[in-house]
Design a protein with these regions (language model features):
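Acidic, Ser/Thr/Pro-rich low-complexity intrinsically disordered segments
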Residues: 28-94
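Extracytoplasmic/lumenal soluble domains of exported proteins with redox or metal-associated functions
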Residues: 32-36, 103-109, 147
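C-terminal edge strands of extracellular/lumenal beta-sandwich accessory domains
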Residues: 5-14, 70-72, 80, 84, ...
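Extracellular beta-rich ligand/substrate-recognition surface
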Residues: 16-34, 96-101
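Structured alpha/beta or helical-core interaction and ligand-binding surfaces enriched in interleaved
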Residues: 10-26, 42, 53, 110
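Beta-sandwich interaction modules
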Residues: 78-84, 88-116
Length: 174
């Protein structure tokens, strides 16, 4: 009788997001800052979609290149790579982007047929400036955002899950 009163579980597609939003901040104009980070994303058989979002803002990049040079693009850059399982350092990345000037927000979408099961590595290496000058108009901060979002089926149990919460189907199989 009590079982009949229980609401049915609801299957939803839920996004799981990985990545970074970073703003460079240094004390002087002559110091660049290095930033690197990486994270592992588990692709199991339930992942149905991958969306990568990337944007870089490198203010005054063309003017500074003329002033101090950046022929090899080593002074200010954002380099992002997504590696499939077991391919890092022995093959080309699944996806990559490199910005040495402003890079408008771009979304890259991949479907299930593009995926190999296992642990994927999202890696970023960047170098930039972040200057707060006494005069606001002379201040600038390099900035980038990169996110990889996977979509997986998730079950919401109304009796135990709060709104927006659910359990990934792949976690129920373990």
């Amino acid at each position: 009788m009590i079982e009949d009163m229980r609401e049915e579980p609801v299957l939803i597609e839920k996004e799981d997001r990985f990545g970074w939003d970073y703003t460079f901040d240094s004390s002087t104009a002559v110091n660049t800052i290095m930033y690197s980070n990486e994270t592992t994303i588990l692709f199991d058989e339930t992942v149905s979609k991958l969306v990568i979002e990337f944007r870089a803002q490198l203010p005054y990049s063309t003017y500074l290149e003329d002033l101090i040079g950046n022929e090899t693009n080593e002074v200010r850059y954002v380099d992002v790579k997504l590696w499939q399982p077991g391919t890092r350092d022995i093959s080309s990345p699944f996806w990559e982007a490199r910005a040495t000037q402003d890079y408008p927000l771009e979304r890259f979408t991949f479907g299930k047929s593009d995926f190999i099961l296992g642990e994927w590595d999202l890696v970023v290496e960047a170098r930039g400036y972040g200057i707060t000058a006494p005069v606001d108009q002379l201040s600038f901060h390099d900035h980038f955002e990169v996110y990889a979002t996977i979509t997986k089926p998730c079950i919401r149990f109304p009796e135990i899950d709060d709104v927006g919460e659910c359990t990934f189907v792949s976690d129920l199989k373990s």
